[in-house]
Amino acid sequence: MKQSMHLIVRGAIAAAAFALASGSALAASNLQVVDSHSVSLFTAAGGAFGSGSAISPTLWEVKYDSNTFLAFCLDPHVAVSNSSNSYSSGAFAASDSVKRLYEGYYASSIATVSTSANSAAAFQLALWELNNDNTNLLTGDLRFKNLSNAVVSQANTMLGVATGNGAIQNLYNYTSLTSVNPASQTLLAVSPVPEAQTWAMLVAGLGLLGFMARRRKGASALT
């Protein structure tokens, strides 16, 4: 649990710093895979982006623009390439269903990856469904004959919440990482939105800095 919490805190802090730098698109920068958390390959017998494709939903830990953070895949048809690692970043317009998925399950899904990747894998399946398919794991391009697999069953539960009518709290900022070469998959990273109290402290701090600067300038003019 200590290792899991360390991963969450480290990822959250790095992603928060990364998000502050990503209010607008950044120039292409090198992306390096630091670690990955996935389940064993299993087959979507009904057809996963092709009849009987073997898939392994994965949570990635990556280093980009001097920051290390966690990211999920947005493009299920493309693998992460070790040779095509030049990426650009920009704000991602998350749908309401994707926001509900993150607000309901992101924190808990990444909390257990050091001991089990099942929740993270289920989260990845749900994200693929919401962003690329028809939100139904029994039909569409990504489909299964049944929901008996533990990861698929958990993903189905997540989809039920994500496509529901739950209130959206806008807890995260969303940033997409897109490979300059389309041969490598697009990734999605998030960072917590600072609470109102945090913003108030930041504004107050900036105001104090401005006041001190004006005071020093005034003192210089008198001497």
Residue ranges and their predicted role:
Residues K2-S29, A183-A213:
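Short, threonine-centered small-residue motifs that mark membrane-proximal processing/anchoring sites
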Residues I13, Y102, K217-A219:
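Sequence-pattern detector for short linear motifs
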Residues G210-T223:
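C-terminal membrane-anchoring or membrane-association module
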Residues A28-V190:
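Short, surface-exposed polybasic-aromatic patches that bind anionic ligands, especially phosphate groups
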